[in-house]
């Protein structure tokens, strides 16, 4: 689909369809009022008749409105004007795109980007409209023998902005939105892949493919033999029960003209399937453990978006691929592992495996002398209990970095919330036999997991994002969400000095 931005009056638009908002109860938006005036009250007369109340998501398609050059006008219910928020705005955009496709529109000029959304500017509204549109059109049906027919005639969508001086901001928003949407799609596709296809070797193949597609990207794959030489015993232990080889994919993007500029490092947990190992998970819902690699998938999607945007920064993405299976060679509760850092860990539960993979990955990235390191992982069920399915958790050893990430989450509407990491929580990780245990009990489970990782991130500024509650959805809408790609790309946009606010 082609996106563009323009600034013009609705009555002068020669398009297949004009999209304008109507507020509850039956109140025309300023743009709809202009059309109503041109049509001698035609639209307001329909509202008085009760054809549209203006409730969120209501749609009314009008044909041949008097005085209007466009063939059709789509009236979109936007709810109460003062209550139009971010979530409702994005839902309205998606419903609008769905209606345009269902009604056969090939092109449309959308004036919904002129609506007032609390605390948001033109850049945000246009970018979110692009992201919401692409996300709403996403499907994953490549494994269906008969592909469902979908009617999608819409080929061109123009977003109108109030003034000509906002055109450049709107164009930038489209560029950013398309790159982010591409990264989100890549992340969702990886997450939704079945685990008999998407194993660690598949992650590595996708990393290589990214390097083939973009000159600014190079890839290195580290297999078990090299991990053995590096002393990544903890990482290797997790994958011992699986016949699929553990592989760590290093994706390097160089965009900074200063070759000595320190890189930002993103590390993604890539458990392509997590059975729990010897500490086997319950059978119900275990199929969703294919999503335990969504941290790696989001890092991959972020690297793809970054390459598309060609930002002037250096970033390294690490996909820590592994599979946790029970087997005669699997690691056990009671085992003591010597990590790459030299610290020892007593395994109390083999289903707390993500941190055992990440700890060695965090030690490995020390060699890059990073500006900062951000790891992303579906790490703890405790985070779902703490924050639900709407907000990701952030823990960090560096206040400015934590602030940057939370700020980026607010800017992108891919929300995160910082959790504490006080010294007292480290007490729960004590072991009588090793330097630490791999779990600290049920209380504060997300925090103690963060405390565990922090022991391997002492040589750089570090943050951890727990996406256990936000990486995928269950039920009828089951599937990967692609989060937190939007947040991570916003963080990188900010780091590269890109202005994304008026």
Swiss-Prot record:
Gene Ontology biological-process annotations: proteolysis
Active-site residues annotated for this sequence: 281, 355
Binding residues annotated for Mn(2+) 2, in chain numbering: 269, 274, 292, 353
Domain of life: Bacteria
Signal sequence, start to end: none
Any one Gene Ontology molecular-function term assigned to this protein's record: manganese ion binding
GO CC terms, sorted: cytoplasm
Binding residues annotated for Mn(2+) 1, in chain numbering: 274, 351, 353
Catalytic class of the enzyme: hydrolase
EC number annotated for this UniProt entry: 3.4.11.1, 3.4.11.10
Free-text cofactor note: Binds 2 manganese ions per subunit.
Pfam families attached to this UniProt entry: Peptidase_M17, Peptidase_M17_N
Disulfide bonds: none
Cofactor(s) of this protein: Mn(2+)
Cell compartment(s), UniProt: Cytoplasm
Recorded catalytic activity of this chain's protein: Release of an N-terminal amino acid, Xaa-|-Yaa-, in which Xaa is preferably Leu, but may be other amino acids including Pro although not Arg or Lys, and Yaa may be Pro. Amino acid amides and methyl esters are also readily hydrolyzed, but rates on arylamides are exceedingly low; Release of an N-terminal amino acid, preferentially leucine, but not glutamic or aspartic acids
Family the entry assigns: Belongs to the peptidase M17 family.
NCBIfam families: PRK00913.1-1, PRK00913.1-2, PRK00913.1-4
Its biological purpose: Presumably involved in the processing and regular turnover of intracellular proteins. Catalyzes the removal of unsubstituted N-terminal amino acids from various peptides.
Protein name according to UniProt: Probable cytosol aminopeptidase
Native species: Vibrio parahaemolyticus serotype O3:K6 (strain RIMD 2210633)
Organism lineage string: Bacteria, Pseudomonadati, Pseudomonadota, Gammaproteobacteria, Vibrionales
């Amino acid at each position: 689909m082609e996106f563009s931005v323009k600034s013009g009056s609705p009555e002068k638009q020669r398009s297949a369809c004009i999209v304008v908002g109507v507020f509850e109860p039956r109140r025309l938006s300023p743009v709809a009022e202009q059309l109503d005036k041109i049509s001698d009250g035609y639209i307001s007369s329909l509202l008085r008749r009760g054809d549209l109340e203006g409730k969120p998501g209501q749609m009314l398609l009008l044909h041949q409105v008097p005085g209007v050059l466009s063939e059709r006008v789509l009236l979109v219910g936007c709810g109460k004007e003062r209550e139009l928020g971010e979530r409702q705005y994005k839902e309205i955009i998606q419903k609008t795109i769905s209606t345009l496709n269902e009604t056969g529109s090939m092109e449309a000029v959308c004036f919904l980007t002129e609506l007032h959304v609390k605390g948001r500017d033109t850049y945000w509204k246009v970018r979110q409209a692009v992201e919401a549109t692409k996300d709403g059109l996403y499907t994953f049906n490549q494994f269906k023998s008969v592909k469902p027919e979908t009617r999608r005639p819409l080929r061109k969508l123009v977003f109108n902005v109030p003034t000509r001086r906002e055109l450049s901001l709107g164009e930038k928003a489209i560029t950013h939105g398309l790159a982010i949407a591409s990264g989100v799609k890549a992340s969702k596709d990886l997450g939704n892949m079945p685990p008999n296809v998407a194993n660690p070797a598949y992650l590595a193949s996708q990393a290589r493919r990214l390097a083939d597609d973009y000159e600014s990207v190079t890839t290195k794959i580290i297999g078990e033999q090299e991990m053995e030489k590096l002393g990544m015993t903890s990482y290797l232990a997790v994958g011992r029960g699986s016949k699929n080889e553990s592989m760590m994919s290093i994706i390097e993007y160089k965009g900074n003209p200063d070759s000595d500029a320190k890189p930002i490092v993103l590390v993604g947990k890539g458990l392509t399937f997590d059975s729990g190992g010897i500490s086997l998970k319950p059978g119900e819902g275990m199929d969703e453990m294919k999503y335990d690699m969504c941290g790696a998938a989001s890092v991959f999607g972020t690297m793809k978006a970054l390459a598309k945007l060609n930002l002037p920064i250096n970033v390294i993405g690490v996909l820590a691929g592994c599979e946790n299976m029970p087997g005669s060679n699997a690691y056990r509760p009671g085992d003591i592992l010597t990590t790459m850092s030299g610290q020892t860990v007593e395994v109390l539960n083999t289903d707390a495996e993500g941190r055992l993979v990440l700890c060695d990955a965090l030690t490995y990235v020390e060699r890059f002398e990073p500006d900062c390191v951000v790891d992303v992982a579906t790490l703890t069920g405790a985070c779902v209990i703490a924050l639900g399915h709407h907000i990701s958790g952030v823990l960090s050893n560096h206040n400015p970095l934590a602030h940057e990430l939370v700020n980026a989450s607010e800017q992108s509407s891919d929300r995160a919330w910082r959790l504490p990491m006080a010294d007292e929580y480290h007490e729960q990780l004590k072991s009588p036999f090793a330097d630490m245990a791999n779990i600290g009990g049920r209380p504060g489970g997300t925090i103690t997991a963060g405390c565990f990782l922090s022991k391997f991130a002492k040589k750089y500024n570090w943050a951890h994002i727990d996406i256990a509650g936000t990486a995928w959805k269950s039920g009828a809408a089951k599937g990967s969400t692609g989060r937190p790609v939007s947040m991570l790309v916003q963080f990188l946009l900010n780091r590269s000095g890109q202005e994304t606010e008026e």
